[in-house]
Swiss-Prot record:
Entries under Pfam families matching the protein: Fer4_NifH
Cofactor stoichiometry and binding remark: Binds 1 [4Fe-4S] cluster per dimer.
UniProt-recorded name of the protein: Light-independent protochlorophyllide reductase iron-sulfur ATP-binding protein
HAMAP family: ChlL_BchL
């Protein structure tokens, strides 16, 4: 099974991807995580350092694929998850999609691409040009990481459009949304109402999730010294279980940009006053109770 993880830049895709990868490994699966970002930091919390990229290695070997060995590009991460960083072209030059293609090509040459139960592509930001949509060509499922904010959901909608486009020619489905580090989910629910799709999980606003990135550790590794964080790992295990159940998934129908802009803007401009609603409900209950006469 191949999974592509997308979402707005800075939303926590890599942190989420690494924890999902370990959760899948904990379920007995052989997992490979491929970072598809020129920053090559996708697997940082799995390995604890920035591993050399495929492009770095190919350049050292003068692009002689026959001189590259699996151990040159595949690094063992925490929890038995194997890690690869595709890397990228120099800033302002080349195409990231080409790099993803070269990565897959090399892994196939090494007979490594088909050795895994799960391959997870962690893809750069919310860029959905043809190049960075390339991992969708190989994926069975796409997962979108979001939060309860306007920008993240707007990006999610554009990614949903990319999934729909790729699904025309590939057996690709959207597995669903994952809400990351958010104290509320009302805007997520509003979006899902307009663009129906599964919500796999919504992780609460837990500071340790952010801290784990800085420490270069996954939540699963942090639990070894902080058992109180065990409940956080359950969120990722729940996502893993849903993925392993091989959900039917959907081909999403994105909301038109202007319509979505209006929908999300209206939610901010005209928030529901829940306090007022509660007062009105109490008043209603009081009035209703007055209608009864005990005999």
């Amino acid at each position: 099974m191949k999974i592509a993880v997308y979402g707005k830049g800075g939303i926590g895709k890599s942190t989420t991807s690494c924890n999902i990868s370990i959760a899948l490994a904990r379920r007995g699966k052989k997992v490979l995580q491929i970072g598809c970002d020129p920053k090559h930091d996708s697997t940082f919390t799995l390995t604890g350092f920035l591993i050399p990229t495929i492009i770095d290695t190919l350049q050292l070997k003068d692009y002689h694929y026959e001189d590259v060995w699996p151990e040159d590009v595949i690094y063992k991460g925490y929890g038995g998850v194997d890690c690869v960083e595709a890397g990228g072209p120099p800033a302002g030059a080349g195409c990231g999609g080409y790099v993803v293609g070269e990565t897959v090509k090399l892994l196939k040459e090494l007979n490594a691409f088909y050795e895994y139960d799960i391959i997870l592509f962690d893809v750069l930001g919310d860029v959905v040009c043809g190049g960075f949509a390339a991992p969708l060509n190989y994926a069975d499922y796409c997962i979108i990481i979001t939060d309860n904010g306007f920008d993240a959901l707007f990006a999610a909608n554009r990614i949903a459009a990319s999934v729909r486009e790729k699904a025309r020619t590939h057996p690709l489905r959207l597995a669903g949304l994952v809400g990351n580090r958010t104290s509320k989910r009302d805007l997520i629910d509003k979006y899902v109402e307009a663009c129906p799709m599964p919500v796999l999980e919504v992780l609460p606003l837990i500071e340790d999730i952010r801290v784990s990135r800085v420490k270069g550790k996954t939540l699963f590794e942090m639990v070894e010294s902080q058992p109180s964080l065990n409940y956080v790992c359950d969120f990722y295990l729940n996502i893993a279980d849903q993925i392993l159940s091989q959900p039917e998934g959907i081909v999403p129908k994105e909301v038109p940009d202007r319509e979505l802009f209006s929908l999300l803007s209206d939610f901010y401009l005209n928030p529901v006053d829940k306090t007022k609603d509660k007062k009105e409900n109490k008043k209603e209950d009081k009035e209703n109770s007055a209608d009864f006469t005990w005999l």
